[in-house]
Amino acid sequence: MKKIIIAFVFLSLPIFGQIKFNDYFLNKTLRLDYYHTGNKTSETISFDKLIEEGPWSGSKKNLIDTFYYGNYIMKVFDQASNILIYSRGFSTLYQEWQTTEEAKTVTRSFEGSMLFPFPKSKVFVEIDNRDRENNYKKIFEKTISPEDYFIIKEKNNSYPDFKVHYSGDPSEKLDIVLIPEGYTKEEMGKFHKDCDRLSNVLLNRSPFKESENKINIWGVEAPSNESGTDIPGKGIWKNTLLNTRFYTFDTERYLMTSDYFKVRDVAANAPYDQIYILVNTNKYGGGAIYNFYSETAVDNNSSDYIFVHEFGHGLGGLADEYGNDKTYEDMYPLDTEPWEPNITTLVNFDKKWKKMIEPGIPIPTPEEVKYKNKIGIFEGGGYVSKGVYRPTMNSIMNSFTSTEFNEVCKDALQRIINFYSE
């Protein structure tokens, strides 16, 4: 079996390398919206709609995902040849909800949406989920014709966009779109200033500062009727564009939105690979999900830290490196290697940062002063104190006392920046 798998990999690589954008795609974007429904032990994906959006701003070279991060992967196949012509890994708010206590007794639906280049000919799209043993299982498939007259072309959510940081052609850069939540029309000037401030914070952190010329950052002027955001635990409800709220999954600081279709609508006004929601509040909070969106409150003393930390999740698929957080139950099975690049259960550590550890560093690595600035294997991470390990004693993915990514996280982020900017 091992020989068969290896042969398949080598046979597949030349095929992937031969995928040329213009052979299969037009220079515009197709959005597939769906509903994700289920509970702790079951899930289904049901189709909602297709929307034609603007020019394709993703890489036209790197069409096939090479990282396999995320709890799901979307694959697009040319129907005539059965060749894989596009794929992306991602995670969802639904999947996080599945790990909560509520999911044991309640069935819920969440909005989901994926983008891919607009195909020239018929394609079939599938979405696979990753089970607890790291195996993929197909849970959705749909054949799509570019001639389908039900593909929506109307533009109902048009807002002005602006450049925050510009380096060049969006198809050759990592494009980040900053979208406002809880900023009224009169507060758009503040939104511009917040975009500038937080973008500067990001571009002054490694590895982003070394890759400044590989990154575009955009803003969208999309005002809300009221300023601020919902705080259900305090009885505060605001009429805002994206319906963000604190107390997501009954965790006060977890600031997210389940209105993902609206998030996509607003983001579509600018080129983007990554979505970042800036929430106009001084209350501490934020959140992010890999290739879904990132979100932060902008006006508290920790906003700069949160902005960078959350983008580590959203862009790089980085895990939280702290333990002792009971928000999620059994997020990382100890008999399976996590897909996140910066934590390990030691089940398959050879695929992680083993080569970055200096000779003589003990494994596991004790939390002693002499190892403070060393890469090792420190127990505690992924919300638990035992059985999950992190690369360093501290980093921005661990606590407020560090403002920098560790070298393992920098390496993971740099590879993704390069992927988008080729």
What are these regions (language model features)?
Residues 24-149:
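Beta-strand-enriched, solvent-exposed domains that form extended recognition/catalytic surfaces
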Residues 74, 199, 304-321:
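Active-site recognition of the HExxH zinc-binding catalytic motif
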